Amino acid sequence: MPSWQASVLNRLLTYVARPSVSRGSAKVPLSAIRQRLLEMDRRLLGWLPELKVEHWPLSHSPLIHYQLPQPREVSLFYIRGGGFCFKTPHAHARFLADIMRRSLADCYVPDYRLAPEHPFPAACDDVLEAYRMTLEHCDPDKLVLMGDSAGGNLALSLLLQLKQLELPLPRACVLLSPALDLGITGDTERILAADDPLFTVESLLRLRGAYLAGSNPMSERVSPLYGCFKDLPPILLLAGTRELLLQDAERLQQAVLRDGGRIEAGFYLNMPHVFPLFELLPEAMEARGQIAAFIRNNLLL
């Protein structure tokens, strides 16, 4: 049974957040929505004074390094979500600080370029360059790749590209509500019937179009669900059952098992998109504990 906090959050998302990114704002430029979200993120969440932040310049966008005043036994490479068009640095920093505490980790975050100003493959290119720099600072056997939503897409795409380029793979991978099939080849009836508290089909199509800008949605780099998952590190996959993107997670689980890979999946009843970021939810705390346990178990801490 979902918590009362989850029920309240779902109502708030449905009546407050969803209209701001759906049909009612179709004529509002994505850049204006981005600025509104950034301002809300800054005002509502603030910063964590104990979090040390460094920005390391790369070709187009920086690599951000987060540290806490604690021993470091593992490193995270986290790709933030935001529909390829937005970012909420404060919300993600608060979430990451908790995962870092639980895992005795530092964290590397690529501040990749955003659509529509920078469509595919800009984000993929930035993430790969940031990963290469991260390898200069940490052992891949002590590195965990993570990503949520669009960042989950970029994380799995990166994993497949690393294998193709024969670059060092991380020890494990964590995906939260990943958007993996931009070709939208899943069950159409289920997609249209989904009661997602945050997104509508129209809003997802708009973000998808801004990112693709005419690129082939069936490309493995755009839609990593179409890749081969043999010889990849173990994956933890978490999603909520009220998501429009739930099928992406379910199909990834099936595909990884088909290819003989290792995947642990958790589908949380009635949870919204990327629910582990909402720190007031008991289910989010449970998911964070699951993430930390997965990291410990796979890095032999």
Residue ranges with predicted function:
Residues M1-L68, L301:
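A glycine/proline-hinged amphipathic helix-loop "lid/cap" segment
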Residues V16, S20, H60-I64, P71-L301:
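Alpha/beta-hydrolase superfamily serine-hydrolase fold, recognizing
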